[in-house]
Amino acid sequence: MHESNTLYGGPMTKLRQAINQVLAAVLLAGIGFYRRFISPMIGPRCRFTPTCSAYGLEAIQKHGPWKGGWLTVKRLLRCHPFTPCGCDPVPD
């Protein structure tokens, strides 16, 4: 078997896709857990529109677990009392 078959369209690509799907599912489940159990206890605190959890869901669904997860982490680091409020959509 040629190396290109294992890297591009072969077993490695399928493995990478499976890992990405599992990672995305774990991240989305974490956001769902936060929304269901933690957010109701602490109340609304996000300074942005959309909220950080909505941003995370959209970013991961739109860009995948790696880039979407990184965008979400950067957003969470910006969400604090010393940051101005406002609209901060997920980039294209």
From Swiss-Prot:
Presence of keyword Nucleotide-binding: no
Classification via InterPro entries: Membr_insert_effic_factor_YidD
Q: Which GO terms describe its cellular component?
A: plasma membrane
Pfam families, per the entry:
YidD
Compartmental location? Cell inner membrane
Keywords assigned by UniProt, alphabetized: Cell inner membrane, Cell membrane, Membrane
In terms of one coarse class, where is the protein primarily found?
A: membrane
Q: How does it sit in the membrane?
A: Peripheral membrane protein
- Where exactly are the transmembrane stretches of this chain? none
Q: Which HAMAP family match?
A: UPF0161_YidD
Query: According to its UniProt record, which protein family does this protein belong to?
Result: Belongs to the UPF0161 family.
Q: What is this protein called?
A: Putative membrane protein insertion efficiency factor
UniProt source species:
Synechococcus sp. (strain CC9605)
